[in-house]
């Protein structure tokens, strides 16, 4: 799916893994229901809750041109306790 860009792995999101929460960057136009349906179908998991936020806009300079990088929405997805996403498993 084009709307889910990639999983996010930072110090905070690694701490969220202990609470069975996973973080993804998604397209701004994607709705929670679309993302929830895609996550459940693709990973065969049960989603309990979803939280989303848009990180603040930041300026970026490339030579004399000042612009903004591509915007995205960050989704924090909580799964039922007996499910997990294999992308994030330690081996």
Swiss-Prot record:
GO cellular component: chloroplast; ribonucleoprotein complex; ribosome
Subcellular location: Plastid, Chloroplast
This protein's UniProt keywords: Chloroplast, Plastid, Ribonucleoprotein, Ribosomal protein, RNA-binding, rRNA-binding
Main location, first listed in the record: plastid
GO biological process: translation
GO molecular function, one term: structural constituent of ribosome
InterPro entries: Nucleotide-bd_a/b_plait_sf, Ribosomal_uL23-like, Ribosomal_uL23/eL15/eS24_sf, Ribosomal_uL23_CS
Pfam families: Ribosomal_L23 (PF00276)
Assembly and interaction partners: Part of the 50S ribosomal subunit.
Family under the similarity heading: Belongs to the universal ribosomal protein uL23 family.
Function: Binds to 23S rRNA.
Record protein name field: Large ribosomal subunit protein uL23c
């Amino acid at each position: 799916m084009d709307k889910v860009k990639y999983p996010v792995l930072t110090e905070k999101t690694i701490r969220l893994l202990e609470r069975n929460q996973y973080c993804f960057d998604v397209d701004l136009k994607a709705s929670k229901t679309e993302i929830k349906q895609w996550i459940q179908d693709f990973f065969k998991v049960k989603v309990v809750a979803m939280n989303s936020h848009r990180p603040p806009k930041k300026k970026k300079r490339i030579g004399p041109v000042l612009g903004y990088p591509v915007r995205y929405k960050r989704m924090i997805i909580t799964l039922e306790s007996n499910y997990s996403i294999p992308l994030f498993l330690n081996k």
